[in-house]
Amino acid sequence: MAAPCHRGVSAGDDAVGTGTSFKRKVRGKFPALPGTRPSVHNGQLLVSTGVPSLDHILGGGLAVGTLLLIEEDTYGTYSHLLLKYFLAEGVVSGHEVFVASANDDPTETLQDLPSPLTDEVPRQNDPKRTKDTSGPADDSQEMMKIAWRYQNLPKVETLPISSSRFGHYYDLSKTMPPEMSAKSHRFYLPRIMSANQKQNVSEVTCNYNQLLESIQRVVHQEGYDGSNPQKRPKTILRLGIESLGSVLWADDICSQERPENQHSLTRFLYGLRGLLRTSLSVCVITVPTYLIQNKAITTRLRSLSDTVVGLESFIGSEMEANPLYKDYHGLLHVHQIPRLNSLISDGSDTKDLAFKLKRKIFAIERLHLPPDLSDTVSRSSKQDLAGSAKLLSSGCGPAAGGEKHLDF
């Protein structure tokens, strides 16, 4: 039986007297983590790869908790450069960095990170600048007779780039100061093997297990999995693994068509993805897939990754001397885009992409053919043109059938 309705009592008085359980539904707020932003497609928290053009191709950036697999180019030059961009972005954004390698010492890799570019920020409320510019004001007015509109604008000074913005640009001609990347986690396989001599299982399985245990230790001790509260402000853990699966990791997938330990790398990726999904971390791995003899293994590696990008370098190939590709250094192939919190992936166009390495920056652009500005573009020789003009003039009647040719 419904409760009787009392007349004479307004709805506002009843709400004040008894209170109400109604609460306005608001959108959930994302954690204010430095160097991150929510995706406009699926609401996933994103971090930058260090290359803004690559972020745009991947749908805005790398989602936290995912794995990016970079298929190395022939000599590994550009793939290792992308890994350095990823690590440099983490250092500038204030993220924790974990570097693992079996070839180059991670300390040397961190010392070779590109330096971030500076922003030109106008400083309007600077007392020193106002004092210095108050004296020669008359001189500046005399000099600004033509460009008088610019004399009241604040001067522009180069300041260090802000760590709170998403995505930065880097100068490849300069390296980052060592103190910026001094605090990081490193895994150097030769040093680990020399300290751990006894191995009860196969060498490659032991190497991958030690790497996974090292990552688990950092994730758990630093509190990225939520088990232990982070002592400092909450941030993101960036994992960078170089040339995983190569012979330097004692793996034989790159040297034999039927390797004995073909499941060691796939088991490692299974464990790594499970660890990434339950922690505030993101990983980038480079794999020399061009050396893998069995292509079925390459297919498995792609299926075990969230995002797969391949680099095809022009070095040593026929396309290096092709004038159509003279402005580029290689092609970028996007093999896989993640499907996170949605049925389909981002619909951005990922075809016909090329990259070029300039003196200071690494850029990814849409592949387009340069305009052909030569004198003989799509034309025959002058003799052929004269012959065709003669045929045309002969069919135009007696008035046009003289000795002169049609001039186009």
UniProtKB/Swiss-Prot annotation:
CDD domains: Elp4 (cd19494)
Keyword Nucleus: yes
Primary location recorded for the protein, binned into one broad class: cytoplasm
Pathway(s) where this gene product acts: tRNA modification; 5-methoxycarbonylmethyl-2-thiouridine-tRNA biosynthesis
MF terms (GO), sorted A to Z: phosphorylase kinase regulator activity
Composition bias, Basic and acidic residues: 120-132
Keyword entries, A-Z: Cytoplasm, Nucleus, tRNA processing
Domain of life: Eukaryota
Cell location: Cytoplasm; Nucleus
UniProt similarity note: Belongs to the ELP4 family.
Record protein name field: Elongator complex protein 4
Naturally occurring in which organism (per UniProt): Xenopus laevis
Gene expressing this chain: elp4
